[in-house]
């Protein structure tokens, strides 16, 4: 139990320290936490929060590779490469084109080893908070032995540009893991 609490606090501290002095969006796990979560579910939510904060908002890819690359991460989004290295490679190129890309988490749900984020992703700072722009995303991660091992998502493009982007980028199959 002490290990879970200590790990959770360290993850939250590392996430906050990196994003504190920037204009990056910060995921506030405390405000999104549900009262019925067990200590293990809170630890799972903190793990995914740290992962998403550093990957999608801080774009701290070196941190992601150092902290999460040892897991056997299976990507079920067929448009993304498999494994953490594939995901980091894709996103590092993506944020070169869209450096203000952010992931505003609206809800977090946890059921045992499954963590679900409902989020609003945008490409531009000016679009943050505008539910007519960007993408409505529901992500599900599976945790096993304190590691993120699987990811599924469902993405709804909210504006014409994102619908066009989804159309032109949606045809490339980057892994053979299946969507379920």
How would you describe each model-predicted region?
Residues 14-18:
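C-terminal segment of classical bacterial N-terminal signal peptides
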Residues 4-13:
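Sec-dependent N-terminal signal peptides
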Residues 61-111:
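A solvent-exposed, acidic/Ser-Thr-rich amphipathic alpha-helical stretch
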Residues 101-104, 132-138:
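Short, surface-exposed coil-to-beta transition loops
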Residues 48, 64-65, 72-73, 87, ...:
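Hydrophobic pocket/interface hotspot
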Residues 19-67, 170-180:
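Short, low-complexity N-terminal intrinsically disordered segments enriched in polar/charged residues
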Residues 112-123:
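A short hydrophobic beta-strand element
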Residues 136-167:
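Short beta-strand edge/turn micro-motifs at domain boundaries
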